[in-house]
Regions:
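Acidic, low-complexity intrinsically disordered regions
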Residues: 1-146
Length: 146
């Protein structure tokens, strides 16, 4: 209900990403090797621009992402609405091929989750994120672009 949750127009995106990376890395570090997944894929979905982080700065998050990619083979996927997702992802060290713009509505969000579901089905089979992972998201976004 509106009493429990309400939109405030704030996105602490860098804090969310930084905390997630640290928590997942800590879990991996405290696990026996056989319990650490062969692939780690971090999916970032936002409907707004960073404007509220207090703990993490852009350069810190970028360094964290680059370290996990280089040292541990993590993959990062970024989906953003109401922003230039390709540019924002790039500023964090996420390649344009792993970033997509989407419409923040029912169809756009559903399209995201279908694409992510297919992506994880492939990753679970031992594959990397496919180059065409965002094909349907791009098709939807471009067909309804204003």
């Amino acid at each position: 209900t509106n009493k429990e949750y309400y939109a405030r127009g704030m996105s602490a995106l860098l804090d969310a990403i930084g905390k997630t990376i640290n928590q997942v890395a800590a879990r991996h570090n405290s696990s026996v090797d056989s319990a650490v997944p062969a692939k780690t894929v971090v999916v970032i979905i936002t409907d707004g621009m960073e404007n509220a982080s207090k703990e993490y700065k852009l350069q810190t998050v970028k360094a964290m992402i680059e370290k996990q990619k280089k040292e541990f083979g993590w993959e990062f996927v970024f989906m953003g609405a109401n922003i230039d997702a390709i540019s924002v992802a790039g500023s964090m060290g996420i390649d344009a091929s792993r970033a997509a713009n989407y419409h923040a509505d029912g169809v756009g969000t559903a399209t995201n989750f279908v694409a992510v579901g297919k992506m994880f089905t492939s990753v679970r089979k031992g594959n990397s994120v496919a180059d065409n992972w965002k094909e349907e998201i791009d098709k939807d976004y471009n067909s309804r672009k204003k």
